[in-house]
Curated annotation (Swiss-Prot):
Protein family according to the UniProt entry: Belongs to the ribose 5-phosphate isomerase family.
Catalytic reaction(s) noted: aldehydo-D-ribose 5-phosphate = D-ribulose 5-phosphate
HAMAP family noted in UniProt: Rib_5P_isom_A
Protein's recorded name: Ribose-5-phosphate isomerase A
Amino acid sequence: MTERNTSTDSPEKRAAGIAAAGLVSSGMVVGLGTGSTVAYTIKELGRRVKEEGLDILGVVTSYQSEMLAIDAGIRLTTLSQDPELDIAIDGADQIDSNLYTIKGGGAAHTREKIVSVSAKRFVVVADDSKTSTQLDKPVPVEVLPFAKEPAVNRIRKLGGEPRLRSAVKKDGPVITDNGNFVLDVEFGVIKDPEALALQLSAVPGVVEHGIFSNVDELYIGKKDGSVKIISRQK
């Protein structure tokens, strides 16, 4: 696997990513998420396209997933052309026992959420390090640059401590694929993710936040190559 896909090979991520790719069949329109675990899914789908004649269309969530899909030989479409997806597969920064999920470490959570809610089935792939009884990691919040300070003030009133995400290899803040800023907001333990999600969505200037409440299934890869599957209780 190339360095653009993952920085280091991970048996757990590989197992989860490849297992989720097995859910895809010819004729499907597939949402392709962003991150190191779903990179294995994209690569496996590409292998099946080339070796098995798998006929699918992919909808990407970021520049990274677009480049991976092109490298893999997956034909791409857009939500404008195909607004209803059969399945979306994505990674997670953290996921709790009720399948509430925090995403956005790659600053792609706005597009990831749009793609996930456009799919009939949303599957998250992860390793054990991403699972937790309750969510407690910072929540990424994409904001309009124009609205940054008012949004910060309102988020503080919700009990959060926002921090503007800085770029690593350039001066200044991270800029999303949509041209916006990202705030990483520390809330401590999040006891009611659904309520917090609604409160963040109501803040003027917030484009989207990284709390996802629509995960249908979680595929957890293990070091021995096995995969544990957890489904949302209906």
